[in-house]
Amino acid sequence: MRKQDKRSAEIYSISKALMAPTRLETTLNNFVNTLSLILRMRRGGLEIPASEGETKITAATRNSGSPSAADYTVPKAAIDQVMTAGRLVVPDVCNSELFKDQIKWRGIGPTAFIAAAVEVDHETGGMLWFECAEESDYDYEEEVHFLSMAANLAGRAIRLHRTISRRERTFAEEQQEQQNSRDEQSQSSARQRLLKNDGIIGESTALMTAVDTAKVMAETNSIVLLRGETGTGKECFAKLIHQHSTRQKKPFIKFNCPALSESLLESELFGHEKGAFTGAIAQRVGRFESANGGTLLLDEIGEIPPAFQAKLLRVIQEGEFERVGGTKTLKVDVRLIFATNKDLEMAVQNGEFREDLYYRISGVPLILPPLRHRDGDIPLLARAFLQRFNEENGRDLHFAPSALDHLSKCKFPGNVRELENCVRRTATLARSKTITSSDFACQTDQCFSSRLWKGVHCSHGHIEIDAPAGTTPLLGAPANDVPPKEPGSAGVASNLIERDRLISALEEAGWNQAKAARILEKTPRQVGYALRRHGVDVRKL
């Protein structure tokens, strides 16, 4: 090959290395190593000092058996001369004043040093250099000329990369500003929806159907039973019903019915007279009296003891009661709303809940959708919770689009309450104003909910619909090994998956129970039982 053709091929090789679609650091390292093969370098490198808005750039050869260029520092005197003259040729560094302070530790024999300045952004700010063994027939002038051409190509490549990088940063900043603007508009809309629907945020079909139904229910005084998983917003819906009813200016009283004794529940709900029991030093008005003319929400109604259920049934039917320790019958006008996440049908079958009370309170049920069925609501809720956090703590945090995408893919078995906790925890620990997907606890395996769902899938492989009492228990486990269905337990997560699978099969079958039974490989009777157990009202759906 002619010498001119050989040089053309070499220039093509280094141009190809510089134009490769890789990161700048990788591109320049490949360029320097390609150059080292052409120029028979012992070692060489490229150095571009840091400038305003740009970081320092270095690249070094990786020749096996040769001294490392990455650990070598070119003398300042040599650098200054390159910057002044644009090039430098030192046939033997051992005899050069420029390198006198570095000869002792180098110990690599007679060595030539050749360098050329690199112009970046119309300023000479860096250099391309290499060393090679001193040879009598070496044409230094030709090599430094070739090195200057290579340095010119490298400078252009660096300028191109920096220009693209600056444009990408500008574009990303503009995109972020636009996203922040959309977030602000969304938060404003969310606040308007919040005011309109009394704290209920969202616009999914499932949620809006429940909201519209609740507003229709508000027009009458009928007893309402709110059903849904924990954290689905039963109290918010109770307030919505109250605020859209004719009782909106009257009291709204809420009472959580935990596993209290009959006497304590009776005292809390009906009140007591002075001296009715030890510690009753004064007359006390109960929740029913406090709610007279308004609305009373009794949450966790499935937890009240059987002995108290008969007394509650009397109040529901007749609207009258006596205070504990009293003889006077009191009558009240109260709109009753009950709420539960418990399987009341199973409780009735097990004798834990009175059948007559069940029919009395379940006449007008409203099933609240879990968060995983509310398509598109998670970003709206997350932004609203973050806005509330910002207002409470004087912060100015916002979500990156990737963060909202990540949240939208989460199951959240604890529903809205769990989502709010997730947002608050992440915001509290946020190290910058922009929350990204990597900031969430589940990314470091610190999310209990994530581990809970993984555990359910890994432990059981698949979930079957519960069969009626007396048949094989859920998942084939002994009846006494089935975990308690308490909020946050694996039993709850299992229950949620069962319900999802049941509804999916029914949707696929067009809500035909016989077809759904074939899909699930169950009998129609088992599917009917599962519908009752999970509170799925086929007629409503």
Curated annotation (Swiss-Prot):
Coiled-coil ranges from the UniProt annotation: none
Protein's UniProt keywords contain ATP-binding: yes
Sites where the protein binds a divalent metal cation: C442, C447
Binding site for ATP: 228-235, 291-300
Residues in GAF domain copies: 23-158
Ranges where the record places region Inter-domain linker: 429-498
A Pfam family this chain is assigned to: GAF
Annotated PROSITE patterns: SIGMA54_INTERACT_1, SIGMA54_INTERACT_2, SIGMA54_INTERACT_3, SIGMA54_INTERACT_4
GO biological process: nitrogen fixation; phosphorelay signal transduction system
Record key words, sorted: Activator, ATP-binding, DNA-binding, Metal-binding, Nitrogen fixation, Nucleotide-binding, Plasmid, Transcription, Transcription regulation, Two-component regulatory system
NCBIfam families assigned: nifA (TIGR01817)
Subunit details: Interacts with sigma-54.
Function: Required for activation of most nif operons, which are directly involved in nitrogen fixation.
Family annotation (PANTHER family): PTS-DEPENDENT DIHYDROXYACETONE KINASE OPERON REGULATORY PROTEIN-RELATED, TRANSCRIPTIONAL REGULATORY PROTEIN
Stated name of the protein: Nif-specific regulatory protein
Native source species: Rhizobium meliloti (strain 1021)
Gene this protein is translated from: nifA
